[in-house]
């Protein structure tokens, strides 16, 4: 077995807002406490109007979105170094609209937005599916395809006139857009029964969700010329999980590599210890092996 060496790949970073041209982000914003962002249909429509304006003004490429009653998701690429300016403009304009319309004062949003950097095609697929599954997992609809305020309809209806660049995501699956659409819908359906938790509650959850999700959709990427680090991680996880004491040198190398990869994705030693059913000291010892 060839354990990867010095191949630490950061595919998903929920902490610092690393900004560079061409970077792809999963943006999350929410209302404070139990407040809501959208009271009625016109609120959703106005936010989408603003998103279209901002997308054009700041040259963003918007891949998908989901507007939930108390929070929202946007998956997008920046083509200039203007992420903060664009998001500030979007959320400030909506906050002014919301407070004016409902004759209220105070914060509409709970602090600053979160920007999760996605730098791998497979994680981009996982993020988009996570976003589109939100309404289903929140019991707002019986089928994610039925939710009105997400971009999922574009992924199966394939509109020719839209501000969404949904084809970018679908082309990861196939250059044949109709075939890619069918594959994407199948992937969404496969994601429905998976354990699901809000990234708002646990900023590392999407990374954990992706590890399971990527293994589930392995067949969709067969034959594609993509990096295999994520599949390596899943394989090594299966190899060493629930093993307290390792004697086989290959198992020892696999555990060390797995821990290094998980650390590079933002997991803490405590998180990794929990995932591998080990003590924190065992994790430190494994890194020194």
Predicted regions and their residues:
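Short beta-strand->loop micro-motif that forms the acidic, two-metal-ion catalytic signature
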Residues: 70-79
